[in-house]
Regions:
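Non-catalytic pre-domain segments flanking phosphatase-related domains
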Residues: 1-13, 39, 61
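Short, structured coil segments at secondary-structure junctions
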Residues: 62-64, 71-72, 178-180, 239-240, ...
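Hydrophobic packing residues within well-ordered alpha-helices of enzyme cores
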Residues: 30, 55-59, 170, 174, ...
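Mg2+-dependent phosphoryl-transfer enzymes with acidic/Ser/Thr/Gly-rich catalytic loops
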Residues: 2-10, 26-27, 199-283
Length: 283
């Protein structure tokens, strides 16, 4: 997993808001730091909410070889081929239940398979918003009745888009009525008036898959580090022995991190800052 062949530790890096700056570029300092980390014995992975197709381009540009964590911990994939190595999935029946709930609350429903995003024609209006997760968007006449996303292995997650009030109500319903099936959260999408409610398989988060990856590599939690900026990074912050919060991270996220970074998603450089500390401390 490293060019030196001797593994000193594992570093998991969030994409949007951490490695990727606000303009979706990678700072030169961060790219160089990742190369240096690999050459000096660290396994580097990406841990993101994006799907396979939204993750692989960045991983390939950086030359990463360690398996990648996608769909907020729902998938562990081969960095070269994109093949799923491990997955946590929502069954087709449960996905249909989620879609029904989203539609009942007046939201536009989306289903995320491992490598594509599925919606109907109304949902396609928000293509510029949802293509952060994946640029592979499949539009169906009716999402509920479409067969294209109904694969035996299930789906990665469901999302509903709408206004703040409707999203909040849908989120509350899913958390109250289906707590044993889904882990549901809702949030604003950037500075837009659009809000999202997202449901993952119950118990699924980045931290769980990160520790599964560490076990594959034969590394203890004390030799695992995570770099992130948002609430979906809290699971891996809790699991990792060392955690780094970006400068723009909310106070609730920074509070649980072991280290606070000065760099932000506007400046870039947070990954380089964190890797520098790890290389100094992990002798």
């Amino acid at each position: 997993m490293t060019r030196s062949g001797q593994l000193r530790g594992l570093v998991a890096i969030d994409l949007d808001g951490t490695l990727l700056r606000d303009d979706k570029s990678v700072a030169d300092a961060d790219a160089r730091a990742i190369v240096d980390a690999v050459e000096r014995g660290l396994a580097v992975t990406l841990a993101t909410g994006r799907l396979i197709t939204g993750t692989l381009p960045t991983a390939r540009k950086l030359g990463l070889v360690t398996p990648l964590i996608c769909a907020d911990g729902g998938l562990l994939i081969d960095a070269a081929t994109g093949a799923a190595l491990e997955r946590r999935a929502i069954s087709i029946a449960h996905a249909a239940t989620a879609i029904e709930a989203l539609v009942a609350h007046g939201l536009l429903p989306y289903v995320f398979s491992a490598d594509a995003l599925h919606c109907d024609s109304a949902g396609a209006v928000h293509r510029s918003i949802v293509d952060t997760w994946s640029r592979e968007i499949v539009v169906h006449p009716s999402l509920m009745h479409a067969e294209g996303w109904r694969h035996p292995e299930g789906i990665a997650l469901t999302v509903g888009l709408g206004n703040r009030v409707a999203v909040g109500r849908a989120s509350e319903h899913l958390r109250q009525a289906h707590a044993g099936t889904f882990d549901t959260v809702h949030f604003n999408l950037g500075q837009s008036p659009v809000w999202a409610v997202r449901s993952l398989p119950h118990g699924c988060d980045k931290g769980d898959m990160l520790m599964r990856l560490a076990a594959r590599l034969g590394l203890p939690g004390t030799r695992v580090a995570a770099i992130g900026d948002w609430f979906n990074d809290l699971g891996m912050f809790a699991a990792a022995g060392r955690s780094f919060a970006m400068g723009q991270a909310p106070d609730a996220v920074r509070k649980v991190a072991t280290d606070h970074l000065a760099a932000t998603s506007a400046t870039g450089g947070g990954v380089a800052e964190a890797i520098g500390k790890l290389l100094a401390d992990w002798t």
